[in-house]
């Protein structure tokens, strides 16, 4: 679809509201203003005007704002009409504008896409707009604003610039091998490369924090029936999210709760008790439980402390441990400490975390919250931090891998050509984050996830 068309969309959420905004972007924005307003508003000044239909009747009245390109959000001529937020009024106004020649409805994210294509935003900043809208906590919102203002992009540009300087030295060493100073063997390039690798690792650490803030952690509570899984879900959620009874198999389906621990989003999933199913409904619930377990970031293995003294997971339930993915982190939760009299606390058992608590009374729940936060490496002090997506983490990981391979080529064989290629590939991976090197397919996937009017 053409990016030279003039586009229009509602920039406020659908439904009733105090204010409804229509946004127009493109070369025909001034023609829309003349047709609907009767004049072109003074640039960047709010003008209170009637919004006219084709026959001259007034559809609504409100604020009109005109931003000539390139000094606008999209870099094109932009007109905003801010009227009353009734859906009927907005639909009538939208139909009025679409009746004009050369106008069409914007695709999801097309305003932000045009801002990116016109160099008003880089790709990381454009993504931050969607992240700010979707932020589920104050900390996530603040980090999204930092990304929108260029905090993440600035770190990436610093790394790219450092790699550019490093490539200059390497290319010089390759092109002028007979010079008195051999840059490849005198340690200068290795020292600079080590510095870039250290800086990249710091950015990766901050990006992992940003990814946790954005996407959160998926924790699945699993175990036998009546181990206290639903009670634990309620204790973590701080409300009666799940029905709790003494009847084994009360939970038949997956229950989900979304909470925050010091700003970190946590997706808690309560599952059906794992056992040989008594009927088809329970069998489906248990199958769904295993599907959730296999996709978890961490499993809370819930154990009824009144039924066993074992603390080693394989000794508690060998069949359960045998089916778990080998790389999946687990925390053994020995429940019902209020009955067994066990000392509350967190310990390590053969490399596994074990916590003793009472889901019914809430004793030990704060210890579990701290453990979940620490197990993901999350720190609540992220002043100046930024949000990151999975694709950002993948690009950073790829760049780090190329730098490690380049370092190996340098120290083992002084292979300048191979080092130069690894540096180029690392730089290319970093540039994918800001969109300086991105395929059209990637851009399409990113912007299609945005709101219509963004």
UniProtKB/Swiss-Prot annotation:
Residues 216-377 form the TrmE-type G domain. It holds the Pfam family MMR_HSR1. It is found in: Cytoplasm. PROSITE patterns: G_TRME (PS51709). Keywords: Cytoplasm, GTP-binding, Hydrolase, Magnesium, Metal-binding, Nucleotide-binding, Potassium, tRNA processing. InterPro entries: G_TrmE, GTP-bd, GTP-bd_TrmE_N, GTPase_MnmE, MnmE_dom2, MnmE_helical, P-loop_NTPase, Small_GTP-bd. GTP binds at residues 226-231, 245-251, 270-273, 335-338, 358-360. Binds 1 potassium ion per subunit. One of its GO terms (biological process) is tRNA wobble uridine modification. GO terms for molecular function: GTP binding; GTPase activity; metal ion binding. (6S)-5-formyl-5,6,7,8-tetrahydrofolate binds at residues 23, 80, 120, 454. Its cofactor is K(+). Mg(2+) binds at residues 230, 251. Belongs to the TRAFAC class TrmE-Era-EngA-EngB-Septin-like GTPase superfamily. TrmE GTPase family. Homodimer. Heterotetramer of two MnmE and two MnmG subunits. HAMAP family: GTPase_MnmE. PANTHER family: TRNA MODIFICATION GTPASE GTPBP3, TRNA MODIFICATION GTPASE GTPBP3, MITOCHONDRIAL. This is tRNA modification GTPase MnmE. The lineage of its organism: Bacteria, Pseudomonadati, Pseudomonadota, Gammaproteobacteria, Enterobacterales. The gene is mnmE.
